[in-house]
Amino acid sequence: VQQARQQASEVQSNQLSVRQELQADCLAGVWAYHNHQRTQFLEQGDVQEAMDAAHKIGDDYLQKRARGQVVPDSFTHGSSAQRVHWFNTGLQSGQIANCDTFNQNI
């Protein structure tokens, strides 16, 4: 990904970065799924707190708060909705194969 980003335009580089970050969100969900299966560590409300956190670190949420406007071409981590979706995808499936953000619509 890093090599592709170096050869891409700024917008394309940002899009690759978003895909990589969303994949990381999905993998975090996969980790939480499997850890919960082994240890039952998730308590009531934990998943909602994780979703709320994912929402609050979306590029659109952060840009709106900081600048008062949203510039999607400048996203490097994904929108709030994307981050919630991909974390939830990993959490619900527990399957790494479902985290292929490079070959799916994001």
Show the residue positions of the predicted features:
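A Zn2+-metalloprotease active-site environment signal
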Residues: V1-T76, V84-H85, Q92-I106
